Amino acid sequence: MLSTRSDAQELAQYQWKHRVIILCGDSHSDSYQKQLNMLSAEELDAKFADRKLILIKDSKEHCDDVFKIMLYGLDGGMKLSSSTVVKAQEIFDLIDSMPMRRAEIMRRNGKS
């Protein structure tokens, strides 16, 4: 799921419903475009849905950095902040290592 953040949205609206990736900075920078292309690949839609993950694009006016990617967990806490491009699989692996995600997987697999 991809949305555009044109003004300062509250992360609280996503808490306990979605994990959130925020991509912010100069949307014309190489890093921003590379990260956006990596995370917008159609083949990742199922992985995003399975992890309750959404991607929000933020404009430079809300971000002092040329490029920054941030990941927030279901609890609303920041789990990752980077000014360099992060591979999608690294993000998925990080999420999959989180206790809430591991509990989701166990419930889905019928294990308590």
Task: Indicate residue ranges for each PLM-predicted region.
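Non-catalytic interaction/Regulatory regions outside core domains
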Residues: 1-112
